[in-house]
Regions:
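Non-heme Fe(II)/2-oxoglutarate
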Residues: 1-72, 87-89
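Residues at beta-strand starts and edge strands
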Residues: 8-10, 75-77, 98-100
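Intrinsic-disorder/low-complexity coil detector
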Residues: 37, 47, 76-77, 116, ...
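A short coil-to-beta-strand element that immediately follows conserved catalytic motifs
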Residues: 68-79, 114
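Catalytic core of non-heme Fe(II) oxygenases with the double-stranded beta-helix
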Residues: 81-133
């Protein structure tokens, strides 16, 4: 497990056992989304204990990187999935109600870009910012 520190957030990168993270999806749904596609929070993990263990380890590492050493409970909200084909993408977005978020890459490579969510706040205050932030 490694910690990556940036100017706006710290990230944890860790290997997980994908065989222990098997899940099922209820109902038919599109696996590739954009902002106009209704998303269903419908994943059920076959081993939720392992998922929580991974999240706890990552959260503990993040909290330690900020020198935060206090007790907390971890609540895992409904989880959704994206499956991308060539040239698919997810528009940029924020998880404004969550303290932490995670991504599990099942196979392949990713062009994931993390942006400072403060930019959305600045855009709301200065909407005519000429695309520079």
């Amino acid at each position: 497990m490694e910690i990556i520190k940036t100017n706006f957030a710290n990230f944890v990168v860790m290997d997980v056992n994908l065989n222990k993270l098997k899940y099922t999806s209820k109902g038919k749904q599109k696996l590739s989304y954009n902002s106009n596609t209704p998303r269903k929070d419908n994943l059920t993990f076959k081993n939720p204990g392992y998922l929580k263990e991974c999240i706890e380890k990552g959260t503990n590492k993040i909290m330690a990187s900020y020198e935060q050493n206090y007790e907390y409970d971890i609540l895992i909200p409904p989880i959704w999935e994206h499956e991308y084909k060539k040239d698919d993408f997810q528009e940029d977005h924020i998880h404004y109600t969550d303290h932490f978020s995670f991504v599990i890459y099942v196979k392949g490579v990713s062009g994931t870009v993390f942006k400072n969510p403060c930019g959305y706040h600045l855009q709301s205050m200065y909407p005519k910012f000429n695309n520079y932030l």
